[in-house]
Amino acid sequence: MAEAQQARVQNAVEEMVQNLEKEHIRKMQGRMFRCSAECCEHPGNSMNQVHQCIERCHTPLAKAQGLVTSELEQFQDRLSRCTMHCSDKAKDLFDSGAKEPAVRALMDGCVGSCVDEHLNLLPSMTRRLKDSLNSIPQ
C-alpha cells in the first residue's frame, strides 16, 4: 500500500483507538485497579481467594481489550484483501502487456479506493465497539 494511503489509515485508526481508550478503556482500567486493591484489603482471605478476586476484577477489561483487538484484526483483514485484489488486477494488467505507468496508475487508484472505502467503515465500527464496550458488565 502506498505510504501516504497507509498513513491515512494508520492515523484514522490510531485516533479511533485513542478515543476509545480515553472514553471507555481508561475508566475500565481505573475500576479494575480499585477492585483489585479492594481484593487485597481482606486479611482473612487466602492467597487463592485474593487471586480469584483479582481475576474477576480484570475480566471486564480483558473482554474489552479482546473486543477491540478482534475488531481491528477484522478491519485489517478486510483492507488487506481489498489491496490484494488491487495487486491481482495490476498483475493481470501488466501480464496483458500494459506499461508500468498504466499499471501504477491502476494500482494507486485501486488502493486509494480501498482506503477510502475502509475509512468510511470506521464510524460504524466505532459505534459498534462503543455499544459492545458499554454492554460489558462491570
Swiss-Prot record:
GO terms for cellular component: cytoplasm. InterPro entries: DUF842_euk. Coiled coil: none annotated. Belongs to the FAM136 family. This is Protein FAM136A.
